[in-house]
Structures are given as structure tokens and as C-alpha cells.
Amino acid sequence: MMTLKNPVHPGRIVKSSIEELELTVTAAAKMLNVSRSRLSNLINGKAGISPEMAVRLSKTIGSTPAFWLRLQMNYDLAEVKKQEDRIF
């Protein structure tokens, strides 16, 4: 199985998707039924994708909730691996 050594924060994928749809952050937040600050935190890498947000993204932007959660999981695992020596 191929894995990325340094996957991007999934918020960057969300941001790209929003831009491809030619939406503003405010408009996308309304479509997702979340606050603008919540979406802003996600796309700026300050928050992750929860299962609830994954469902919202799949219904609004596309793909599946599992896709969005896998992006988050891969990112989180890569971040932990960077600190593996300090963990053990």
C-alpha cells in the first residue's frame, strides 16, 4: 500500500474544493450549515475533520464521508510518526 510521507492537512483539500466550486468561505459555511469560523479553522489547518464534518462535506462538496475521514487519519498518523522517537 502506498502512503504519503507528508500528507497535506485535509483542510487544504477542502479549501481547494471550495475554490473549484467558486464559493466563498462564507457561502460554503452556509451550505455546510456550520459557522464561518469553524470552516475557517478547518481550511487553515487549525481544526480537523470530525465524522460529523465528513458527512457534511460529502453531502455538500462530494465524495464519501470515509474519504474525508481517511484524509484526516493519514494526516494525523503522519504527524504522530514525526514524533515517534519522543513517544517511545
Regions found by a protein language model. Name each.
Residues 1-23, 70:
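A short, Lys/Arg-rich alpha-helix, primarily the initiator
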Residues 2-6, 30, 81-82:
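Short linear interaction segments
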Residues 10, 64-65:
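Hydrophobic side chains within well-formed alpha-helices
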Residues 19, 30, 59:
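Short polybasic/polar patches that bind polyanions
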Residues 23-41:
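Short alpha-helical DNA-recognition segment
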Residues 35, 46, 61, 72-75:
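The DNA-recognition helices of helix-turn-helix-type DNA-binding domains
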Residues 46-59:
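Short, basic-rich loop-to-helix N-cap that marks the start of a DNA-contacting helix
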Residues 66-88:
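Short, charged recognition helix plus adjacent turn
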